[in-house]
Regions:
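Juxtamembrane intracellular "pre-TM" segments in multi-pass secondary transporters
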Residues: 15-16, 198-228
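Extracytoplasmic
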Residues: 22-56, 77, 241-246
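Helix-breaking motifs and short loop linkers at transmembrane-helix boundaries and internal kinks
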Residues: 53, 85, 106-112, 123, ...
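Conserved MFS/SLC helix-loop-helix module at the cytosolic interface between two early adjacent transmembrane helices
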Residues: 72-111
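Paired small-residue
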Residues: 96, 100-103, 111-119, 317-323
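Helix-loop-helix hairpin linking two adjacent transmembrane segments in secondary transporters
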Residues: 112, 141-142, 149-195
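Cytoplasmic helix-loop-helix junction between adjacent transmembrane helices
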Residues: 116-157
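A late C-terminal transmembrane helix in Major Facilitator Superfamily
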Residues: 340-376, 385-386
């Protein structure tokens, strides 16, 4: 028994010793695959619509077909990773993603392209779950919040820089070149993970309890529920913007692909500032203060987008300006809420990360599917949906900070 405990201690120490820089690099390239897939095709919407003989608005369904399996698959990846480790899950998921990318690359019918997008989401769900889990394996407390803020700053680049690269590739080589790039990038990432990544969950720390018991244990915490609602709603607002803005900027305003891709980059400073502020505010004041400021920002950004829509207007400045403010708030909320949600679960990090990642992407997929039902003639539907998501995030945070009855307290971990 003493020998087992000593080996367990050594393995935990090895995991904790993984440097912040190296951990951030692994998480960044893993998450970048999935996030780049989500937005790289946006500047190509017009070209894809012409080739597949569908309307540009119909291509909003691509993001829904990608995000829904992306979210659902994380429920499987997370609990499996608590049992067999993180590395095997990452490698298997990336292999499935590569197959989906190749299907999308060679698809000549819209239905097959949607199948490819579905398989992509099914595979890269491993990245969504593990990007939240790896940091919890190695850090906790204030250090975990700091690491999550740093990771958030790195992760925002891929979904917003990807359209710039996608626009360039589309103009130079055609829209299919974006999916060739994604396939090659995923192959490079899986090789890196196989050769350089060390397992962050030691064998002695792996949970063998039934899946439903793991989910019940995590979801029984009222604060986790509130953080989850906040994260799902905030991310859904981001996803709806990413899906609709390309249609509005390219389809309604008639801007060229390169201009649309450059406009997508402009909200980046807002998110970076938010992720930096989240760490500063949490360190000098309280987590609650960071959450309030982030919530105020996403509400304000939603209103900036919605108000011109009430007048039947669609303008680039209100879309990008409102998105920048919304991204600022999201940058503050994401690391703070993720840290608050996962901190109580050191032995259920995979399950907790899977729930957060899975529900965020499932919620985003359903929100974009809902948004696709409305005509994309102006920015009013986008503004209304983003405002509704902000109000839902407010309700989630209210649940976090409302004291729960003693009977609802989270059970003691075994």
């Amino acid at each position: 028994m003493i020998l087992i405990r000593y080996c367990f201690y050594l393995e935990i120490t090895m995991s904790a010793s993984l440097s912040v820089a190296k951990l951030t690099f692994f998480i960044a390239i893993l998450a970048a695959v999935g996030q780049a897939t989500q937005t790289m095709y946006v500047p190509s919407i017009g070209y894809m619509a012409q080739e597949f003989l569908v309307s540009p608005a119909a291509l909003q369904a691509v993001m829904a077909c990608y995000l829904i399996p992306y979210g659902l698959s994380q429920f499987v990846y997370g609990t499996l990773s608590d049992r067999i480790g993180r590395k095997p899950i990452i490698i298997a998921g990336l292999a499935i993603y590569i197959i989906g990318s190749l299907i999308a690359l060679f698809a000549h019918q819209y239905s097959w392209f949607l199948v490819g997008s579905f398989v992509q989401g099914l595979g890269i769900g491993c990245g969504g779950a593990m990007s939240r889990t790896l940091s919890r394996d190695c850090f906790d407390g204030a250090e975990l919040h700091k690491v999550n803020s740093l990771i958030s700053m790195c992760l925002i680049f891929s979904p917003l820089v990807a359209p710039v690269l996608g626009g360039y590739l589309t103009e130079s080589f055609g829209w299919r070149s974006s999916y060739l790039f994604l396939s090659l990038f995923a192959i490079a990432v899986v090789i890196t993970m196989m050769t350089s990544m060390v397992e962050t969950l030691p064998a002695a720390a792996r949970k063998k309890e039934p899946v439903l018991r793991s989910y019940h244990y995590v979801l029984s915490d009222r604060r986790f529920q509130g953080y989850l609602i906040c994260l799902v709603a905030t991310f859904a607002g981001l996803a709806v913007f990413e899906a609709a803005a390309g249609v509005l900027l390219g389809g309604v305003l008639g801007l060229p692909a390169t201009t649309v891709s450059l406009l997508f980059v402009l909200p980046i400073p807002g998110y970076l500032a938010g992720a930096w502020l989240s760490n500063v505010i949490a360190r000098h004041w309280r987590e609650k203060t960071a959450m309030r400021i982030g919530l105020l920002a996403i509400l304000t950004g939603s209103l900036v987008i919605m108000l011109p829509g009430l007048l039947g207007l669609t303008t680039a400045w209100s879309l990008i300006g409102g998105a920048t403010i919304y991204f600022l708030g999201a940058g503050i909320l994401f690391p703070a809420a993720t840290t608050g949600a996962l901190s109580p679960f050191p032995y259920h990090a995979g399950t907790g990360g899977a729930i957060l990642g899975g529900m965020q992407n499932l919620g985003a997929g359903l929100a974009t599917l809902f948004a696709a039902m409305f005509p994309a003639s102006d920015q009013l539907p986008l503004g209304i949906i983003m405002l509704l998501m902000s109000v839902l995030a407010l309700w989630g945070l209210k649940r976090v900070y409302t004291k729960q009855p003693p009977s609802d307290e989270m059970p003691i971990a075994i």
